[in-house]
């Protein structure tokens, strides 16, 4: 059997098909790519529908990642808590802190997990084959057989629980709860979350995927488990491989876990948000000794394009670099010259189904908002009239293309994240990894007036633009802390004697669990075999 590669070249498929079939997989497509320095293999697990992509490029630094589409339905941070919790021990590896133990012995070049607004990923990289396989198995066991299913202590530790202080007053505790209290005290995080809230009221992006401290305590252990079972399923899984991976061994590991499940039909679709104009205001805390004058942040935000329009998305990034990439960039220079703002920045978030832009003016002078917005209009209108500097556009395109072709390390992880920019939404996982055709189109755009028209669409058309004001406050922090205290006091006031005893027992069990060290037998499950030299498997043709 043969297949045509993307360059029209034929190559045999028999060995690859046999290898896949042996482990319950079916090869869907194989394409060669000069840009990827190898080929992309796509397959699916026949029983569950789990998808797998392998970028077979001979890289010694091998990457494995299992990813799930995770769509928040509220701001409890359930998927952030799950990301932490599944890595607190599993059926084969019942160690309380596998990360800590793995870092002591593994040769991993990357070892982490990440929660995004619409996905959660578990990537590892290693140059050592045996280490790579061990890491892949630990992660597969973590996501498909976690101890959270039997041990609620993990949820209480990583998510939230109530403790009583020395005076008997209730307090919220929990790793994610504390992490997000810190994150949400940062003004940049507040601007980011408010922007999502305003732009996306009708889909998952409007929720705080990391968790809002005001809403994290709304999550129950039962809800936590329901969301795990609904989303952490092979039918919703995407497995990404990159480099000189031992495919037969990886598929053996994967099949061991996938075969335990039956297919689920839920597709977890993301409805597209219809763009609209909106205005919003929020407060952020400053120190009691600080003056509130000239401390307002002004953000202009807009949905840019659907995920599939990679040319427009990349063009927007290039445009922002030309407009605000340095103090001499025309838009930033004009705004700073007014003396009415301290800094200007533009950003684009493209790791989602609907990439969006933000233009933020920091520490603007009180009463200067309309003047600054008019300066944006006047500057952009003048640039549209005269045309953007062609040399600046060319330089930015060249820099962007270099970054796309040389993504840095671990390159396999970056390819995985980029592939998910299309793959997660039903698109071609190869599309975001190929840059030659895209940059050819961008150069054609730069030769004409396409960038000028894009600039006008994004910055002059306010019919779909959101305006977010983030204003300083001496009382915001105190108000939030008082609100939390009042909530806890109300909860405590409603406790029955049975509730008090249940909390005491729960916290005693949690403390005992936390203070019980892993046994030698448990730690031995993570002992890794070290090989002095990286190994490269024989390629499967």
Which residues does each PLM region occupy?
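Non-catalytic terminal extensions that flank enzyme cores
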Residues: 9-63
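An aromatic/glycine/proline-enriched structural segment found at the starts
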Residues: 11-20, 238-296, 386, 488-501
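M16/MPP (pitrilysin/insulinase) zinc-metallopeptidase core fold and M16-derived inactive scaffolds
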Residues: 38, 56-141, 145, 153, ...
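Scaffold signal of the M16-like zinc-metallopeptidase fold and its non-catalytic homologs
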Residues: 89-91, 135-149, 166-235, 248, ...
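Acidic/histidine-enriched alpha-helical segments
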Residues: 146-178, 246, 265-279, 379-416, ...
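Structured mid-domain segments that build the active-site/substrate or prosthetic-cofactor binding neighborhood
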Residues: 298-391
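Extended, domain-scale alpha-helical bundle/helix-rich regions
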Residues: 447-481
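Single conserved hydrophobic/aromatic residue that forms the stacking wall/gate
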Residues: 529-533, 537-540
């Amino acid at each position: 059997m043969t297949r045509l590669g993307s360059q029209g070249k034929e190559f045999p498929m028999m060995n690859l098909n046999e290898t896949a079939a042996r482990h319950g997989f079916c090869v869907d497509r194989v394409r060669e790519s000069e840009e990827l320095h190898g080929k992309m293999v796509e397959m699916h697990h026949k029983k569950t529908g789990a998808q797998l992509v392998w970028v077979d490029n001979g890289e010694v630094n091998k990457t494995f990642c299992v990813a799930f589409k995770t769509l928040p339905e509220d701001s409890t941070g359930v998927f952030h808590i799950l990301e932490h919790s599944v890595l607190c021990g599993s059926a084969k590896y019942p160690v309380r802190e596998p990360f800590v133990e793995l870092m002591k012995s593994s040769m991993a070049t990357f070892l982490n997990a990440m929660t995004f607004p619409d996905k959660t990923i578990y990537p590892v990289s290693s140059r050592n084959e045996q280490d790579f396989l061990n890491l892949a198995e630990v992660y597969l066991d973590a996501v498909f057989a976690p101890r959270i299913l039997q041990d609620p202590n993990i949820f209480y530790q990583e998510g939230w629980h109530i403790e009583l202080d020395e005076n008997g007053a209730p307090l919220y505790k929990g790793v994610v709860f504390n992490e997000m209290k810190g994150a949400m005290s940062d003004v940049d995080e507040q601007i980011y979350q408010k922007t999502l809230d305003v732009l996306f009221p009708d889909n998952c992006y409007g929720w705080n995927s990391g968790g809002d401290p005001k809403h994290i305590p709304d999550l129950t252990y039962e809800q936590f488990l329901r969301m795990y079972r609904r989303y952490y399923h092979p039918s919703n899984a995407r497995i990404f491989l990159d480099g000189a991976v031992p495919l037969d061994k990886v598929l053996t590991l994967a099949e061991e876990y996938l075969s335990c499940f039956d297919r689920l039909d839920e597709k977890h679709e993301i409805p597209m948000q219809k763009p609209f104009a909106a205005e919003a205001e929020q407060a952020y805390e400053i120190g009691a000794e600080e003056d509130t004058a000239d401390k307002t942040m002004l953000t202009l935000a807009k949905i840019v394009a659907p995920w599939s329009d990679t040319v427009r998305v990349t063009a927007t990034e290039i445009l922002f670099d030309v407009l605000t990439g340095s103090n001499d960039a025309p838009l930033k220079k004009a705004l700073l010259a007014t003396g009415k703002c301290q800094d200007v920045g533009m950003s684009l978030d493209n790791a989602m189904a609907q990439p969006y832009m933000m233009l933020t003016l920091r520490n603007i002078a009180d009463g200067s908002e309309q003047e600054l917005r008019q300066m944006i209009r006047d500057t952009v209108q003048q640039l549209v009239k005269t045309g953007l500097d062609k040399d600046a556009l060319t330089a930015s395109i060249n820099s962007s293309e270099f970054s796309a072709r040389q993504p840095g390390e671990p390159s396999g992880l970056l390819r995985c994240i980029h592939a998910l920019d299309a793959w997660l939404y039903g698109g071609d996982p190869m599309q975001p990894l190929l840059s030659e055709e895209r940059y050819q189109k961008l150069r054609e755009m730069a030769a004409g007036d396409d960038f000028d028209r894009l600039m006008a669409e994004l910055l002059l058309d306010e019919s779909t633009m959101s305006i977010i004001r983030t204003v300083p406050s001496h009382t915001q922090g105190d108000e939030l802390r008082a609100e939390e205290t009042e909530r806890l006091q109300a909860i405590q006031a409603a406790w029955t004697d049975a509730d008090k005893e249940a909390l005491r027992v729960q916290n005693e069990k949690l403390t005992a669990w936390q203070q019980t060290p892993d046994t030698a037998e448990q730690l031995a499950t993570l002992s890794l075999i070290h090989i002095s030299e990286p190994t490269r498997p024989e390629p499967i043709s």
